[in-house]
């Protein structure tokens, strides 16, 4: 069941015993959150698994969601999932005339600005076919079309993800029982990632982040192969999305536990995802509240207990969110939540409680997620 997370925020804030000035500041910050949109451009050649990736990340069949073609950027499909807008863009390799047309329309979209004058596209996710040995057209697209037109902070606005890791060596060395690469394939994939980064840096002087994963696949509605490194993919998507917009992803993530389970665990992606979501939510909601609190006496009943109360509540809530990840995640979540709750508790305990209660709701949305 899908929940309206931002409505949960509003409901909990309204129930708190807050000074009216603090409450209005929080509601104003919440309104800012509600207006945030993430525009994710997904680029890749036919057969690289763009649709599968979108489906498995967000738990939707893209053919069944609102699809439209932008009249000024023909060939670019637009999917709207609440405040998340996914722009599905073709890769190159369809002939010179088509490639020139695709390139021009991609560039136009990359230069497009929102109503505030900021670049519309927050992140470009380039998906490569891990089973292909010829990535020449993909490099041409990345080096000559995408990166030169990304504006400032180019490194933080592009992520290159190599899909179909399971067939990178024609199906060899993939452990189907473990749903993970064996040593030979893992080494091959690591080299491929480094090769991609090196070739892009040599051509553009830009150091991009690159990972490998497998979106898995379904046949006739039944899961035939689970995804691999999907948590890693989400982690890097969040890291490359403006912090104040990261909470937008929460309402749209796939809620099937099995989809997020298998990863290389080179990094603690669970903790990283928790910190991104919790930190972003707390940061936006608490922004400016300290200034209001400093000028108001007795802001909250029991405000003197703010630090300890916030820390305790944050720990409980972080644990609840962490339970999405399983037993290990619950421990991580408690630790992260304790820190976040303590920081906000230093501003005002009940604000921490309100934010933390909402974060508890985040955890409940996904049940056994991760």
Which ranges hold each PLM region?
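Eukaryote-biased recognition of electropositive, low-complexity segments
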Residues: 370
